[in-house]
Regions:
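Phosphate/adenylate-binding glycine loop and adjacent helical scaffold
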Residues: 4-198
């Protein structure tokens, strides 16, 4: 189960732009995103479970062919769906696998690194771009490509299993299995090593 989100000592402050209600977690979490009149949310292909009210959907590659291809290499879908509301409505989202959802608010000062396959939805002001994790993740077999989320606004991520969030103080060390990492602040210093004799 992918179950952990890590952030540094100066956790990102709250900047809510959409109302999100998460229910039925941690095993089968369901997120209801309430859009104000004129509001839009970008959703991973296949993650929309329902809509209610005045909701229109538009499908695109969000940034063109190359950006869509980079998302595919990062474990996400080539296409994303934008759900917009003229007079207000609700978009319900759920992950493909059983598990939990987490509502994260970014203030634009720092990026959030998200494990490939964990991004579910965000406001259009959040840019989601694939980033190779480098040699330090190559030999781990996990997280070769991470998603780098930048901008200000709301973001929903999913985990296969329950989610637990940790705040690290300066200099603190937390050891995790790479298969259980959902997201972490870009400012968190990390390295990957083999466990045991494998």
């Amino acid at each position: 189960m992918r179950a952990i989100r890590v952030h540094g000592p100066d956790r990102l402050p709250t900047l809510g732009t959409m109302q999100v209600e998460i229910s039925s977690g941690p095993a089968f979490a369901f997120g209801e995103i309430t859009l104000p009149p004129g509001g839009t949310v970008r959703v991973e292909a296949g993650a929309m479970a329902m809509t209610r009210g005045d909701i229109q959907m538009a499908t695109s590659t969000q940034g063109g062919f190359m950006k869509g291809l980079k998302r595919t290499l990062g474990g996400e879908s080539f296409f994303v769906n934008d759900f917009s509301s003229g007079s207000g409505g609700v978009v319900g989202v759920a992950a493909a696998l059983p598990g939990d959802l987490d509502h994260i608010m970014l203030d634009g000062s720092r990026a959030l690194m998200v494990q490939s396959g964990s991004w579910i939805a965000s406001v259009p002001s959040i840019d989601v771009d694939s980033k190779w994790g480098g040699g330090k993740t190559f030999f781990s077999g996990e997280g070769l490509i991470l998603l780098r989320c930048t901008g200000a606004g709301d973001l929903l991520v999913s985990a296969y299993g329950a989610l637990r969030s940790y705040t690290l103080v300066a200099g603190e060390v937390l050891t995790l299995d790479t298969g259980h990492v959902v997201a972490f602040d870009e400012g968190v210093t990390y390295n990957v090593r083999k466990a045991g004799s494998w």
